[in-house]
Amino acid sequence: MNQETVQTDGIHHSRIGKYPHNEIIGKSYGTKIQSHEGKKSVYILRMTPEMWTRALPHRTQIIYLPDIAFITQMLDLKAGYRVIECGTGSGSFSHSLARALSPNGHLFTFEYHELRAELAKKEFEEHKLSPSLVTIQHRDVCKNGFGMGGESGFVDAVFLDLPAPWEAVAHAKEALNPAKLTRICCFSPCIEQVQKTCAALRVNGFTDIEMFECLSKEHSVYKYEQIRTFTLNATEYKQTSTDGKLLTKRAKNYNCESEADDGNVRLIGRPVVQIKGHTSYLTFASLIKK
């Protein structure tokens, strides 16, 4: 999957063909466009956070859809919430968060690396994520905090994707709304990071501390039809049987594709040989209102 900014007289070149932008402009989403070579075609699709996660330029390691969905659920995010994301990175999770909080919520996202912050801000503007919905800052939150709380307003949830999230836990507590139950999530690849983060969460009064690893395990499903059998008398089967009971034998020329279904169809599944492995540990905790 590729992302493309369409403009007048532009041309999209790929290994499957050439696609002039003028033939795309004005077409409805879902339209199938044939290449000039006439060999391959592409579909015009509306950009969604899921598609952006698959097509974005990688400036850092990103958070993928299974983790995104799980984090959004466990933080109990809703439209209208105010949320801090620390570690904007390539902006994969930022787009999903913005959709979850819209239309009247707000995402405050922070990035330590200045160039990455500038590139992410440019992408937000190109994707029509208005400043009223998403605010990005270049800031070292571990040293300087989030600059939120009190007159700046509190938030309902915090997400930390940092090398040392335990250094930002105290600052996160200051930014969380003390008048309600709030949640925090820390995304850490290594178990040693989880241990230090859990210790910092306990010291700062967080409760219900849980750690999860979100793994996707795909299964291949097959249609299986049992081989039918027919019965013969022992004498016709050319076998000796002292009690004269009927014997059972498989039909030699049975074709499961052409024969009528007799109800013996089964669906069976098995795990695929290769599965996606560890991405990160997700540590969640709650801060009870005062």
Give short role names for the model-derived ranges.
Residues 81, 105, 180-182:
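Glycine-centered, small-residue-biased loops immediately flanking beta-strands
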Residues 1-46:
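N-terminal auxiliary segments of SAM/dcSAM-dependent transferases
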Residues 106-111, 186:
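Conserved SAM-binding motif I beta-strand of class I
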Residues 171-266, 272-276:
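C-terminal substrate-binding/active-site "lid" region of AdoMet-derived donor-dependent transferases
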